[in-house]
């Protein structure tokens, strides 16, 4: 039987993801901190933090894992028709702080957000170091949606998305996967399956298969200009 590991401030390494609990699914370790080195080590090994505001830091590696292959996003005809009617524009890394704040904002039927001030600061640090990135959706000069995540080699680890207009987060996802495909990325890690991701074509794969893919792709090369701040198109 697997047991939960407890991390201290000086312990940068994680136990193998295969040692994660089955209930709750994927819980691997407790404790540690959110310093950039630890976070990068976690994602490099298929582990991510997820915890509520007043909880200790919890580290996860669930089985199965939700993933996308760039280019395999499921886009319905009705969504394409809807998006063609909009005059939205899209950008990369133009307003990362605003995107993560948008993702952290309370949502309907949700009493609290897991994206605490500490989480926001941690990922802002990763963004400043060139590891965390955002996609923005604009209506004129108003930010109406977006998403953020981390780039680990040829893998993009999606963290969260938000929308203030119908389908704006889906538009951000379309822009992201088209951009990743152009830049040489091979996999989008969506972490935990849910109906929204399933509707977009996410696939659930066994953790061992995900870890095999990750080990193959995490040191791979992509376009070095992938994350320059710029406007990007959407192809419908």
Swiss-Prot record:
Catalytic activity, EC: 2.3.2.6
GO CC, any one term: cytoplasm
Family annotation (SUPFAM superfamilies): Acyl-CoA N-acyltransferases (Nat)
Cellular localization per UniProt: Cytoplasm
Record-linked Gene3D superfamilies: Leucyl/phenylalanyl-tRNA-protein transferase, C-terminal domain (3.40.630.70), Leucyl/phenylalanyl-tRNA-protein transferase, N-terminal domain (3.30.70.3550)
Keyword Transferase: yes
GO biological process, one term: protein catabolic process
Biased composition (Polar residues): 1-13
Listed GO MF terms: leucyl-tRNA--protein transferase activity
Family: Belongs to the L/F-transferase family.
Name of the protein described by the UniProt record: Leucyl/phenylalanyl-tRNA--protein transferase
Species whose genome carries this gene: Shewanella piezotolerans (strain WP3 / JCM 13877)
């Amino acid at each position: 039987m697997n047991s939960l590991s407890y991390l201290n401030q000086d312990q940068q390494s994680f136990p193998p993801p295969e040692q994660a609990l089955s209930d709750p699914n994927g819980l691997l370790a407790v404790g540690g901190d959110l310093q950039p080195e630890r976070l990068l080590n976690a994602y490099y090994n298929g582990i991510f933090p997820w915890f509520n505001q007043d909880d200790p830091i919890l580290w996860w590696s669930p089985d199965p894992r939700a993933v996308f292959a760039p280019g395999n996003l499921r886009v319905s005809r009705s969504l394409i028709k809807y998006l063609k009617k909009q005059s939205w524009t899209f950008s990369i890394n133009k307003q990362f702080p605003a995107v993560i704040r948008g993702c952290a904002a309370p949502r309907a039927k949700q009493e609290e957000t897991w994206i605490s001030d500490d989480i926001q600061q941690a990922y802002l640090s990763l963004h400043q170091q060139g590891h965390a990135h955002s996609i923005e959706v604009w209506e004129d000069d108003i930010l109406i949606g977006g998403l953020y995540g981390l780039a680990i080699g040829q893998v993009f680890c999606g963290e969260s998305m938000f929308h203030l207009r119908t389908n704006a987060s889906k538009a951000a996802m379309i822009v992201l996967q088209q951009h990743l495909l152009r830049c040489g990325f091979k996999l989008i890690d969506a972490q935990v399956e849910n109906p929204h991701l399933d509707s977009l074509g996410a696939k659930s794969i066994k953790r061992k298969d995900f870890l095999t893919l990750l080990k193959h792709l995490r040191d791979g090369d992509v376009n070095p200009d992938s994350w320059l701040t710029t406007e990007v198109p959407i192809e419908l």
